[in-house]
């Protein structure tokens, strides 16, 4: 059993949603077909895939449901975290009863493949040049949500040893050499590996955190960065 990650699928199967992705460049051409092909070739039914947000362009759950059903039909268990564009996300208890292979994760940790998966959406961090007082409220709330999930993972880890893997949708820090509350929390809880999405385009790829900083490995897993190939974590 293996653990993979890929985010920012940006699906729009519903007839009520018109969001073609190929307008964003060649990495997005035929992206749904490319993802299906690479997923089917990589992920087995007993594996798990973490999806750190931006799953569907739907504004309502009914509009996102065809996208989620398509994901449900792919091999493996899926752990889905909320992203910036997941405006359809509403009523997690109800959502978690809708699909056989999908678990929606919020304010908690999930045991998976000998590891403990936890995280939150995140937000832009105080080092961002456009950071405002309104952003500060959301940022602090997201730090609290991350800590809640890390606390649960730490309790699970006390009962049975296993790696804690952190998940964010936003990058953990806006500027590579800055430091954020998200990073501090990952350090405090001994998290050695974090995945995130949200970042797109060649300039974005160059200017986002990747690799080991302060003892934690940061991995960008947005669809276009991975070219649709799920990243194997375990």
Where do the model's predicted regions map?
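Short amphipathic alpha-helix with an adjacent loop that forms part of the alpha/beta core around
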Residues: 40-41, 153-157, 233-234
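Generic enzyme active-site microenvironment
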Residues: 6, 52-53, 81, 167, ...
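Conserved catalytic scaffold of divalent metal-dependent phosphoesterases
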Residues: 9-14, 86-177
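Core catalytic region of metal-dependent phosphoesterases/phosphodiesterases
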Residues: 2, 16-112, 178-191, 214-215, ...
């Amino acid at each position: 059993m293996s653990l993979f990650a890929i985010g920012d699928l940006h699906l729009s199967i519903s007839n009520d949603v018109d969001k073609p992705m190929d307008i964003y460049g060649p990495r997005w051409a035929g992206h749904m077909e490319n993802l299906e092909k690479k997923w089917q070739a990589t992920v087995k039914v007993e594996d798990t895939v973490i999806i750190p947000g931006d799953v569907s362009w739907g504004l309502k759950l009914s509009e996102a449901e065809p996208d989620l059903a398509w994901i449900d039909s792919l091999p493996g268990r899926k752990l889905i975290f909320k992203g910036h564009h997941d405006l359809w996300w509403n009523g997690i208890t109800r959502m978690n009863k809708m699909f056989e292979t999908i678990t929606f994760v919020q304010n908690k940790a999930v045991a998976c493949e000998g590891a403990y998966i936890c995280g939150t959406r995140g937000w832009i961090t105080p080092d961002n040049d456009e950071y405002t007082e309104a952003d500060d409220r959301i940022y602090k709330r997201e730090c609290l949500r991350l800590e809640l999930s890390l606390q649960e993972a730490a309790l699970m880890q006390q009962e049975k040893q296993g790696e804690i893997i952190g998940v964010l949708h936003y990058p953990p820090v806006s500027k590579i050499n800055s430091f954020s509350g998200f990073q501090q929390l990952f350090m405090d809880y001994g998290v050695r590996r974090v995945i995130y999405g949200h970042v797109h385009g060649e300039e974005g790829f160059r200017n986002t955190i990747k690799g080991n900083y302060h003892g934690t490995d940061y991995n960008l897993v947005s669809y276009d960065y991975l070219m649709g190939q799920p990243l194997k974590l375990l």
